[in-house]
A protein has these predicted regions:
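Juxtamembrane interface at the cytosolic side of transmembrane helices
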Residues: 34-67, 222-256
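Short, aromatic-rich amphipathic segments at membrane interfaces
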Residues: 8-22, 195-235
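Transmembrane signal-anchor/signal-peptide helices with a preference for the extracytoplasmic
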Residues: 44-46, 70-101
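Long, solvent-exposed extracytoplasmic domains/loops
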Residues: 93-213
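Membrane-embedded hydrophobic alpha-helical segments
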Residues: 61-71, 181-182, 186, 190
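Membrane-embedded alpha-helical segments of integral membrane proteins
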Residues: 2-50
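Aromatic-enriched hydrophobic runs in primary sequence
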Residues: 3-22, 97-108, 133, 184, ...
Length: 256
């Protein structure tokens, strides 16, 4: 369900951006109306290619209306999808702002970092810390702490944006080099620290490193989104055109 919601959020985001360009939106509506009219004409008359005597019924008129509406919606979506990259980047920015304000997530990732570092058994947890964190004096601890925050931040993005994440990374799993790159930068940033800082700061650093990678992958959103909508349009249009064509063919058999 989240996958569909994430896709629809990109769809609506793209439409909103399109409406922010009044002239382009107006031209799009004109083209959509024209093509929708052609869609009506095509659905109502294409069956006469093999059955000149066929007359559409009220049911067929409804199917023609469906084909018309689908054509109109398709044109608007297809044009608006030129802005899906911009919509995706807005989603990435919103995610980046939201993740550092999600107290439940920050608490869970801090606890996970504490547990993972403590499991290593190489730090003295009896020492007091200045920021209420946990000791990360050893290189192994720094690496483990960075891995926890990097992977947790990525998992948060994947959970909240399942559709977008599949496009950004184009694989079932996040490329290992992406994780390693974030880990390396976190370690570099905290190399002079002897303890963990508040989870919000560490997550923010992971977000800052991850956002450019996400924006880079977001370039693929436009062709993929348009490919999906074209495939859906053709698939769904088979219903009205197929039913009308089948009715005309059946009527031809009865007449003969």
């Amino acid at each position: 369900m989240l996958l569909i919601y994430d896709f629809l959020s990109l769809v609506f985001g793209s439409i909103v951006i399109l409406t922010g360009h009044p002239k382009e939106f107006a031209v799009t509506l004109v083209i959509a109306f024209v093509l929708a009219g052609l869609g009506w004409y095509g659905a109502a008359n294409y069956s006469k290619l093999w059955n000149l005597q066929f007359r559409t019924t009220a049911t067929h008129a409804i199917l023609c209306l469906v084909a018309t509406i689908l054509t109109f919606v398709f044109v608007v979506l297809f044009v608006s999808f030129k802005y899906t990259q911009e919509a995706a980047e807005s989603s990435i920015e919103a995610w980046g702002s939201g993740v550092v304000k999600d107290d439940a997530f920050l608490e869970s990732v801090a606890q996970r970092g504490y547990d993972e570092v403590k499991k290593l058994g190489i730090e003295d947890f009896s020492k007091p810390t200045l920021h209420g964190g946990y000791p990360i004096e050893k290189p192994e601890s720094k690496k483990k702490n960075a891995e926890v925050f990097a992977s947790s931040t990525i998992e948060y993005f994947i959970h909240n944006h399942p559709f977008l994440s599949k496009i950004v990374w184009s694989k079932e799993t996040v490329p290992q080099q992406t994780v390693e790159r974030i880990v390396a930068r976190i370690i570099q940033f905290f190399d002079s620290k002897q303890e963990s800082l508040p989870a919000k700061i560490e997550v923010q650093f992971a977000v800052d490193e991850l956002k450019p990678l996400l924006r880079e992958g977001a370039i693929r959103v436009v062709p993929i989104a348009r490919g999906i909508i074209v495939a859906l349009f053709l698939l769904v249009q088979l219903l009205p055109f197929g039913l009308i064509g089948w009715a005309a063919w059946r009527d031809l058999k009865v007449t003969v």
